[in-house]
């Protein structure tokens, strides 16, 4: 299931952060889950789409 949300915060040095989804809950994100080339980071307020894994 693909969800969308906004990056609540992301610590590039530690490599993790949280994304806030529409219902107000937070989803943990680790840098290893970020797709794309180059440095893997997210900006606060950035709109993202993602899949949740158990």
UniProtKB/Swiss-Prot annotation:
Gene3D superfamilies in UniProt: Nucleic acid-binding proteins
Main location (coarse class): cytoplasm
Domain CSD, first and last residues per copy: 5-54
Top-level taxonomic group: Bacteria
Keywords (A to Z) from UniProt: Activator, Cytoplasm, DNA-binding, Transcription, Transcription regulation
Localization: Cytoplasm
GO annotations of cellular component type: cytoplasm
Record-linked SUPFAM superfamilies: Nucleic acid-binding proteins
Database matches in InterPro entries: Cold_shock_CspA (IPR012156), CSD (IPR011129), CSD_CS (IPR019844), CSP_DNA-bd (IPR002059), NA-bd_OB-fold (IPR012340)
SMART domains: CSP
Gene Ontology MF: a single term: DNA binding
Subunit details: Homodimer.
Function: Can bind to ATTGG and CCAAT motifs (Y-box motifs) of single-stranded oligonucleotides.
Protein name, UniProt field: Cold shock-like protein CspE
Protein source organism: Bacillus cereus
Gene for this chain: cspE
């Amino acid at each position: 299931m693909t969800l969308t949300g906004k990056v609540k915060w992301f610590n590039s040095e530690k490599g993790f952060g949280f994304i806030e989804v529409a219902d107000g809950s937070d989803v943990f994100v680790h840098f290893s889950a970020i797709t794309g080339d180059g440095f893997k980071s997210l900006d606060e307020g950035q709109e993202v789409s993602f899949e949740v894994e158990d």
